[in-house]
Regions:
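Acidic, contiguous N-terminal accessory segments
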Residues: 21-148, 341-350, 357, 485-488, ...
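Feature activates predominantly on carbohydrate-active enzymes
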Residues: 98-273, 280-282, 286-304, 333, ...
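Short tryptophan-centered beta-strand motifs in secreted/extracellular beta-sheet-rich domains
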Residues: 184-186, 230-237, 527-531, 577-598, ...
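Active-site neighborhood of glycoside hydrolase catalytic domains
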Residues: 257, 262-362, 366-380
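Flexible, acidic glycine-rich loops studded with aromatic residues
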Residues: 355-361, 368-509
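Extracellular glycan-recognition modules
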Residues: 502-563, 651-665
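Short, aromatic/His-centered strand-loop micro-motif at the edge of beta-sheets
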Residues: 561-584
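Flexible glycan-contacting loops in extracellular carbohydrate-active proteins
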Residues: 602-659
Length: 665
């Protein structure tokens, strides 16, 4: 009997051991940013299709989850109140000091419990659930505690030198929210380099992108935001957990203001600098800030306002002291309006005696040559980490990254790294981290699509390093592969990806609106069509989209050509007046290629424009007629001719167009 008991016991132990070996706990699910803590369990939870809320404050969060889940999967969920059941997602607010304002807990078993101390934390938790459900219909069982390592996790977009539509900014906000990036800074004024405009400040573009009643006509005619539009944009961002930081940059980068009021410009250092000896400068800027910050419902709604202060000349002691006084004045002015001022770090560059009070303000630390981290920390400044050589992108520039390699960010950087100094992780004086995209090179052919292409990979890497920080465990190669599978955000396709290729239209009729999944075909595709040619007038359009037009006969030369935003380019090829032709357009991220009857006809690749002296024939750029009006032969810039092919509407053409096909390049 004793022997039988021993045998049975051994058999049970063996069975238990075998069962334990075969059962596997769920690995940490891949989401961006990476979860800061995960304890996997066994099995998955099938969704019931219900989102249960007990607190009315979470109703909108639940509705947002249902909306975005449907956009992502085509399936529906319903918001309900009452007792949770199997497969329900349950949202709750519970006081939890450990979580802070933005952290949350997940407990996924028979139900999925998402608890947070605030609606912000709950919203971020729903972004995690959406990513988990991106490629699978069930949720992995387990527990997560997810808490951001840094408060400000952001991106700065230069809208001063390049205008971006409200519709694009709203999509950008959706993308940022999907990756828990909570801060968008809009750089609202700036100017081009005068070298590219004949060395003449009057000819050099300078733009301010916000409507002003105080100074009618100040806002740029080629694109600006009304005050109502900016208020609406901020409210939209707030609904996604994002704060917008408006930036009005001065006392340098002010050409828009000195074009408007020439007497404010510096005769010694150029019109892109204010003359700080002129008291009218203070009057002008005081009134501008008053317009946007005064009253019960100010135009600048958020907690932060950026006052600029970067790259002003520091040639003399007197100039440095005037700059410091100017900086101090606007820090205190912004504080009087109840806001927290942010400024670009420049106080090592502008060293001096005039006090600049760090209390209640934040430095954007972008260059150790302008502001030394150890000195600024010792002086008591709170700081945003955004070291230029690590996190700056300048499209088509030769002096900064054109396309930022995000492997360095992911492998080596956190907001504790300021470029010249690494502070202790989560040092209380580190406000957070940001990256920036600057449109320095005015007129370089870069479109909103090219900008977005440069933003996306970096945004995902920055999201990880600002939220998860030093707790990151996913190897870079794995991150780089899997991040692409998450897409941009529910309902967002700024990359122009075309699903279910190939897409075919057998007979393209003129003057029609097309029902295709995209309005413009993104890079990495080829668009082919057959055309039985008839005479076409100059300006005859094949297709149009939100940002582009493709011509069968362009309005200038009568050749195949296209318009992207304000940029016009054409091939050196005109369709015959009769006969059959096969056309293929390849659109890559750096070129637009034309094939005629299967043969490569022309590549419209990037070209370099040299700044030339008008009287120096030897330096004249051959080829294209588009030239820069400038004089310095040592300066140059690249010009891009890449096309998102428009496919929203057809034009009024005479020729018969058939077999239009969209496929992979």
């Amino acid at each position: 009997m004793r022997r039988l008991i021993i045998v049975v016991s051994l058999l049970i132990a063996t069975m238990m051991s075998t069962t334990g070996a075969s059962a596997q706990t769920n690995a940490k699910p891949f989401v961006v940013p990476e979860l800061t803590q995960w304890n996997g369990a066994e099995g998955t939870m099938a969704l019931s299709g219900r989102v249960v809320v007990s607190n009315k404050k979470l109703t909108k969060t639940a509705q947002d989850l249902c909306r975005d889940y449907q956009l992502e999967t085509g399936k529906t969920m319903t918001v309900v109140q009452g007792k949770p059941g199997k497969g329900d997602i349950v949202l709750a607010i519970k006081q939890d000091k450990k979580l802070g304002k933005e952290g949350y807990r997940l407990n996924i078993s028979e139900t999925c419990s998402l608890t947070a101390a605030s609606t912000d934390g709950a919203f971020w938790g729903t972004r995690t659930l959406l990513q988990m459900l991106k490629k699978q219909s069930n949720l992995p069982q387990g527990k997560a505690v997810d808490i951001p390592q840094y408060g400000i996790r952001g991106f700065m977009l230069d809208t001063g030198r390049k205008f971006f539509s409200i519709s694009y900014l709203k999509n950008l906000i959706r993308v940022m929210a999907y990756y828990k990036m909570n801060t968008l800074q809009l750089h609202l004024n700036d100017n081009a380099f005068k070298d590219f405009f004949g060395g003449d400040w009057i000819k050099t573009p300078g733009d301010f992108r916000l409507e002003s009643d105080t100074y009618p006509g100040l806002a740029s005619k080629d694109g600006h935001y009304t005050k109502a539009e900016l208020i609406d944009l901020q409210q939209f961002a707030e609904s996604y957990g994002i704060q917008i930081i408006p930036e009005i940059d001065s006392p340098a980068h002010v050409l828009a203001f000195t074009h408007y009021r020439p007497g404010l410009g510096s005769k010694e250092f150029g019109m892109d600098h204010f003359d700080l000896e002129n008291p009218e400068v203070y009057t002008f800027m005081d009134n501008l800030f008053k317009e946007y910050l005064s009253g019960k419902n100010p135009v600048f709604r958020g907690k932060y306002v950026n006052i600029g202060t970067d790259e002003y000349n520091n040639a003399t002691e007197e100039l440095r002291e005037k700059f410091r006084a100017y900086t101090s004045h606007y820090l205190e002015l912004i504080k009087k309006y109840g806001k927290t001022p942010i400024l670009w770090g420049a106080l090592s560059h502008a060293y001096g005696r005039t006090p600049v009070n760090p209390k209640g303000a934040i430095l954007g630390m972008w260059s150790p040559f302008m502001a030394k981290t150890k000195d600024m920390k010792a002086d008591g400044w709170n700081m945003i980490s955004m070291p230029d050589w690590t996190v700056y992108t300048v499209p088509l520039a030769d002096y900064y990254h054109d396309i930022l390699p995000n492997d360095n960010i992911y492998k080596n950087w956190t907001p504790a790294d300021f470029g010249d100094t690494k502070l202790k992780e989560q040092d209380p004086q580190i406000a957070g981290g940001m990256f920036a995209l600057w449109n320095d090179l005015y007129g370089n052919g870069i479109t909103v699509h090219d900008v977005h292409l440069r933003i996306m990979p970096v945004l995902q890497a920055m999201a990880v390093k600002c939220w998860t920080g030093q707790l990151t465990t996913v190897p870079y190669d794995s991150f780089e592969t899997q991040r692409k599978e998450l897409g941009e955000a529910p309902g967002v396709n700024e990359s122009g990806c075309v699903p279910n290729l190939p897409v075919k239209i057998s007979d393209l009729q003129p003057n029609k609106t097309l029902s295709l999944p995209v309005h413009e075909v993104g890079y990495g595709h080829k668009i082919s069509f057959s055309i039985d040619c008839k005479p076409e007038q100059k300006g005859t359009i094949l297709t149009t989209g939100p940002d582009a037009t493709f011509y069968l006969s362009d309005p200038v030369s009568g050749k195949l050509g296209f318009l992207r935003e304000a940029y016009f380019d054409h091939f050196d090829y005109a369709l015959p007046k009769e006969g059959h032709v096969e056309i293929t357009i390849e659109n890559t991220s750096s070129a637009t290629n034309l094939y005629v009857n299967g043969q490569l006809k022309e590549k419209l690749e990037q070209i370099r424009f040299y700044v030339v002296k008008p009287t120096d024939k030897a330096n004249h750029m051959p080829g294209r007629t588009w030239q820069l009006d400038a004089y310095e032969p040592k300066r140059s810039m690249r010009y891009q001719r890449a096309l998102f092919f428009p496919i929203q509407k057809t034009g009024n053409f005479n020729s018969r167009v058939t077999n239009l096909t969209i496929d992979k390049e």
